């Protein structure tokens, strides 16, 4: 192997996605590979909502710009999540070998590219990858490895980070909106393993509502209700308390805000006078675009602790936490305790042109509202 013709999805500034993205061709000369360099080839690159926010210029984590693609001006490469195979290693590289499957450890790697030339042992990021498998290891498949970095890792940390004293007898509950999201589907699976009961809130009026409810129950949700039900006095004062009984709704996971987020607080169980355990409201998204408001009496008398969660911030603050979380999620896959959430795969021939590449990505972005899109390379 001497020269690799590669493609990347690039942009020079944030804005309207269909107008700012380009398909950029570039090449990698493996004959000049440095002793501490590796070449990786894409196996799968997801399209996530955070990627689109970053492209639009509305995301707090900014992209990295590079001149390594020989473009007239520095460009950013889209994407924060991706699975790659190591195909070339430098003479001094001992931590990776050809055939290893790796994912970027840090955000803003720029995953939407067919290949990358990466230098190891940089002071700012000495080991940029997490090894998740290899082509001769059949215990983890591509479907599991391709999306392990964000959604299941977020779900794992949401359950693990805020409540440290889960009731071992199974009397604790989680209530979450966005129940049909990728994160929501992993939350119910991981919670079930830990003997934590869950109430998943989904949007009312979806045509496939019965199918969604069945899927969530099959994954391990204890109860599934609609947002209208969650906001109703009957569910707040009678139905949900009847389910919970002597237990406690100790954690509310909010990715919607607005009325949906406010309703979660109403379902939290807390007594500031008698209970040392503070129920937690954790916000990790705001899909409604509306503010999160709830009454001062609920905050005071229930002793509600409100926290924000962001996987990107956790990873930047403590990169090892990302490594540890990914390894724990992979262990759950290997044991069969959790299963991957299906995504919509779009196949791309890695030898195709950069024009074909950008067309496929724009199609995937346009269809991302119908479910998670992942570019799968062959």
From Swiss-Prot:
<feature type="binding site">
    <location>
        <position position="372"/>
    </location>
    <ligand>
        <name>NADP(+)</name>
    </ligand>
</feature>
<feature type="binding site">
    <location>
        <position position="151"/>
    </location>
    <ligand>
        <name>NADP(+)</name>
    </ligand>
</feature>
<dbReference type="InterPro" id="IPR011032">
    <property type="entry name" value="GroES-like_sf"/>
</dbReference>
<dbReference type="GO" id="GO:0006633">
    <property type="term" value="P:fatty acid biosynthetic process"/>
</dbReference>
<dbReference type="InterPro" id="IPR013154">
    <property type="entry name" value="ADH-like_N"/>
</dbReference>
<keyword id="KW-0496">Mitochondrion</keyword>
<dbReference type="Pfam" id="PF08240">
    <property type="entry name" value="ADH_N"/>
</dbReference>
<dbReference type="GO" id="GO:0141148">
    <property type="term" value="F:enoyl-[acyl-carrier-protein] reductase (NADPH) activity"/>
</dbReference>
<keyword id="KW-0275">Fatty acid biosynthesis</keyword>
<comment type="function">
    <text>Catalyzes the NADPH-dependent reduction of trans-2-enoyl thioesters in mitochondrial fatty acid synthesis (fatty acid synthesis type II). Fatty acid chain elongation in mitochondria uses acyl carrier protein (ACP) as an acyl group carrier, but the enzyme accepts both ACP and CoA thioesters as substrates in vitro. Required for respiration and the maintenance of the mitochondrial compartment.</text>
</comment>
<keyword id="KW-0443">Lipid metabolism</keyword>
<feature type="binding site">
    <location>
        <begin position="203"/>
        <end position="206"/>
    </location>
    <ligand>
        <name>NADP(+)</name>
    </ligand>
</feature>
<dbReference type="InterPro" id="IPR051034">
    <property type="entry name" value="Mito_Enoyl-ACP_Reductase"/>
</dbReference>
<feature type="binding site">
    <location>
        <begin position="284"/>
        <end position="287"/>
    </location>
    <ligand>
        <name>NADP(+)</name>
    </ligand>
</feature>
<feature type="binding site">
    <location>
        <begin position="180"/>
        <end position="183"/>
    </location>
    <ligand>
        <name>NADP(+)</name>
    </ligand>
</feature>
<dbReference type="InterPro" id="IPR036291">
    <property type="entry name" value="NAD(P)-bd_dom_sf"/>
</dbReference>
<keyword id="KW-0276">Fatty acid metabolism</keyword>
<keyword id="KW-0444">Lipid biosynthesis</keyword>
<comment type="subunit">
    <text>Homodimer.</text>
</comment>
<protein>
    <recommendedName>
        <fullName>Enoyl-[acyl-carrier-protein] reductase 1, mitochondrial</fullName>
        <ecNumber>1.3.1.104</ecNumber>
    </recommendedName>
</protein>
<feature type="binding site">
    <location>
        <begin position="309"/>
        <end position="311"/>
    </location>
    <ligand>
        <name>NADP(+)</name>
    </ligand>
</feature>
<keyword id="KW-0809">Transit peptide</keyword>
<keyword id="KW-0560">Oxidoreductase</keyword>
<comment type="similarity">
    <text>Belongs to the zinc-containing alcohol dehydrogenase family. Quinone oxidoreductase subfamily.</text>
</comment>
<feature type="active site" description="Proton donor">
    <location>
        <position position="59"/>
    </location>
</feature>
<dbReference type="GO" id="GO:0005759">
    <property type="term" value="C:mitochondrial matrix"/>
</dbReference>
<keyword id="KW-0521">NADP</keyword>
């Amino acid at each position: 192997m001497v020269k690799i013709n590669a493609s990347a999805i690039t942009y020079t500034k944030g804005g309207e996605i269909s107008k700012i993205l380009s398909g950029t061709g570039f090449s990698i000369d493996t004959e000049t590979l440095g002793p501490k360099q590796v070449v990786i080839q894409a196996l799968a690159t997801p399209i996530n909502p955070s990627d689109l926010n970053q492209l639009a210029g509305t995301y707090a984590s900014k992209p990295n710009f590079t001149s390594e693609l020989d473009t007239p001006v520095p460009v950013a490469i889209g994407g924060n999540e991706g699975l790659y195979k190591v195909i070339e290693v430098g003479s001094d590289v001992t931590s990776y070998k050809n055939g290893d499957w790796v994912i970027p450890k840090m955000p803003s790697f720029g995953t939407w590219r067919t290949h990358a030339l990466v230098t190891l042992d940089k002071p700012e990021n000495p080991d940029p990858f997490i090894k998740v498998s290899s082509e001769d290891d059949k215990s983890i498949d591509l479907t599991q490895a391709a999306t392990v970095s964000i959604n299941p890792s977020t779900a794992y940390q949401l359950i693990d980070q805020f409540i440290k004293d889960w009731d071992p007898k199974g009397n604790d509950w989680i209530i979450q909106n966005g129940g049909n999201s990728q994160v929501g589907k992993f939350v119910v699976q991981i919670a079930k393993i830990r003997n934590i009961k869950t109430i998943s809130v989904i949007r009312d009026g979806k045509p496939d509502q019965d199918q969604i409810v069945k899927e969530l129950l099959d994954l391990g949700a204890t109860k599934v209700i609609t947002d209208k039900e969650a906001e109703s006095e009957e569910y707040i004062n009678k139905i949900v308390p009847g389910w919970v009984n002597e237990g406690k709704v100790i954690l509310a996971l909010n990715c919607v805000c607005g009325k949906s987020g406010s309703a979660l607080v109403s379902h939290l169980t807390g007594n500031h006078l008698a209970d040392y355990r503070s129920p937690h409201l954790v916000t990790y998204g705001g899909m409604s675009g509306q503010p999160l408001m709830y009454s001062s009496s609920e905050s005071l008398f229930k002793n509600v602790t409100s926290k924000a969660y962001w996987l990107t911030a956790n990873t930047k603050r403590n990169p090892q936490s990302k490594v540890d979380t990914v390894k724990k999620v992979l262990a759950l896959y290997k044991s069969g305790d959790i299963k991957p959430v299906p995504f919509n795969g779009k196949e791309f021939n890695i030898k195709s042109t950069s024009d074909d590449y950008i067309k496929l990505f724009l199609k995937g972005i346009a269809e991302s509202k119908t479910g998670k899109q992942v570019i799968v390379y062959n």
